[in-house]
Amino acid sequence: MAQDGVELEKSVRRLREKFHGKVSPKKAGALMRKFGSDHTGVGRSIVYGVKQKDGQELSNDLDAQDPPEDMKQDQDIQAVATSLLPLTQANLRMFQRAQDDLIPAVDRQFACSSCDHVWWRRVPQRKEVSRCRKCRKRYEPVPLDKMWGLAEFHCPKCRHNFRGWAQMGSPSPCYGCGFPVYPTRILPPRWDRDLDRRSTHTHSCSAADCYNRREPHVPGTSCAHPKSRKQNHLPKVLHPSNPHISSGSTVATCLSQGGLVDDLDHLILEDLKEEEEEEEEEEEDGGPRE
């Protein structure tokens, strides 16, 4: 797919995500082709149309800017705005975020136990789903209290702040005073790009199978450090993601498959290629795959 095709697909997916998938791919594609992939302008014009057509007192709470005249008068935009009515307390925030060109997103960890594959993705906050690149199955994120990786610690005893490999809920000794400290959060890979910020300390924790175990250890616990996992012949996945059961409303967006390290355009091309392959397989098999 050419670069302009990638830009068109990105704009279609972003426009659809702004309105939580309520704009069909066909309508979004037509609008993006008509207005040069300007998802920001079209999104704001749709919000303006909703505000003008709604007529309720609630519409006064929606801060909608006056769009360009060609978009304001466009019948396709007006039709989409009409289809999104009525304005309610529940969808007011969606329209306001679309007006502000915002798509709330979060960085989440995913893990496929079948492939022993772990990855991070920035996903839309309202629909946290990602696909394993190896088996192509879709998964929910790893629960927040089960995440593992590079963790951030704040020692309550000596006030020392440090980083180290851990799983949420498993204590590690403070490098300053040795006091057992629980991690406050797991950091996405991009947080560790700056080599100067990496810890110079050798990993050590209280897990029973840690390669550099600190005593007293905690029986029945497992070390999250890759070296311990490899040394003990354990899988990379400490806690698997649950398979995603589709409700039919998931919007495949550039955010939903946007890697934290990889190039965005490459990922969208890869995502489109995978979708084409899935469609071909469905045709060959005579129906959709489970």
From Swiss-Prot:
Keywords: Antiviral defense, Cytoplasm, Nucleus, RNA-binding
Motif segment (Nuclear export signal): 261-269
InterPro entries (alphabetical): SHFL
Motif (Nuclear localization signal): 121-137
Keyword Calcium attributed: no
Coiled-coil features, chain-numbered ranges: none
Sequence segments annotated as region (Disordered): 51-71, 221-242, 269-290
One GO molecular-function entry: RNA binding
Listed GO biological process terms: defense response to virus; negative regulation of translational frameshifting; negative regulation of viral genome replication; regulation of translational termination; response to interferon-beta; response to type I interferon; response to type II interferon; response to type III interferon
Region (Interaction with PABPC1): 102-150
Skewed-composition ranges (Acidic residues): 272-290
Compartments where found: Cytoplasm; Nucleus; Cytoplasm, P-body
Keyword Lyase listed: no
Cited Pfam families: UPF0515 (PF15135)
Superkingdom in the source lineage: Eukaryota
GO cellular component: cytoplasm; cytosol; nucleoplasm; nucleus; P-body
Disulfide-bond pairs as recorded: none
Protein's job: Inhibits programmed -1 ribosomal frameshifting (-1PRF) of a variety of mRNAs from viruses and cellular genes. Interacts with the -1PRF signal of target mRNA and translating ribosomes and causes premature translation termination at the frameshifting site. May exhibit antiviral activity.
Subunit comment: Interacts with PABPC1. Found in a complex with PABPC1 and LARP1. Interacts with ELAV1, MOV10 and UPF1; the interactions increase in presence of RNA. Binds to ribosomes. Interacts with GSPT1.
Protein family membership: Belongs to the SHFL family.
Protein name listed in UniProt: Shiftless antiviral inhibitor of ribosomal frameshifting protein homolog
Organism: Mus musculus
Gene, per the UniProt record: Shfl
